[in-house]
Amino acid sequence: MENNDNKQKKTFHYVLLVTFLIIILIGLVCVLFVFRNNLKAQNDYNSVKSSVEATTAQIENSDTDLAENPIDFDALANTNDEIYAWITIPNTNIDYPVLQSKTSDLFYIDHDVNKNYLFAGSIYSEFSNLRNFSDRDTVLYGHNMLDGSMFADLHKFEDEDFFNENKYIYIYQKNRKLTYEIVSAYNYDSRHIMNSFNFADDNVFQEYINDVMNPHSDVRNVNSDVELNLDSKLLTLSTCLNGNNDGRFLVQGVLIKDEPTY
């Protein structure tokens, strides 16, 4: 009887060990898959960036009275005609094309610039926003990736010193550069901004910009030197909260310069 008990214990321990090893193996495979996927994505984005950077010849032949545009949008259109802008934030890893699908709002939540599946997705806007940034608020979305890619670096603006020292967001389009001064950065709830507010109503928009300047959040930084009014054009960058998918972290800026580029 004792021998049977020992055999059962050994069998149980063996099964437990095998199960544990299988779980570890599956975990390692998943980590490897995510790592390779993210590495491929970063390489793809770097390749896209290098292929569409304006050449020295283009710069030298340009009208020097115009602002510099580092992106060759003609080359970018050959990659994907749903790319309509490029976003850059100094001192962050945020330096990406901006897309808007013609068929599905959520397509680029898990697809790259080449329209291939990618867990990290892309930086994108939805149908509720025009592609010319003329709306009272344009919302761009990006994942909060653990490797620091996509919109993960938005969380740097939680730090007051970083927030105060890095004030601008740059959006490039063909022959155009938009400069936004950052107004606020804060934790927000899970509401869909464009579906929750009727920005055509001046009263609604006024209340909204009041909240932008005075967010209802314990985690917030605000640039009190900026003034917003009914003519303001906002840019909202939205990503997940750290360790919490039931809310958003927002960095919001106001358009201060819209200039032609070569």
Go through the PLM ranges and name each one.
Residues 1-12:
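N-terminal Lys/Arg-rich, disordered targeting/topogenic segments
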Residues 2-3, 17, 22, 42, ...:
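N-terminal leader/presequence segments that precede the conserved core
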Residues 15-33:
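Sec-dependent N-terminal signal peptides of Gram-positive bacterial secreted proteins and lipoproteins
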Residues 27-262:
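Solvent-exposed, non-transmembrane regions of membrane-associated and secreted proteins
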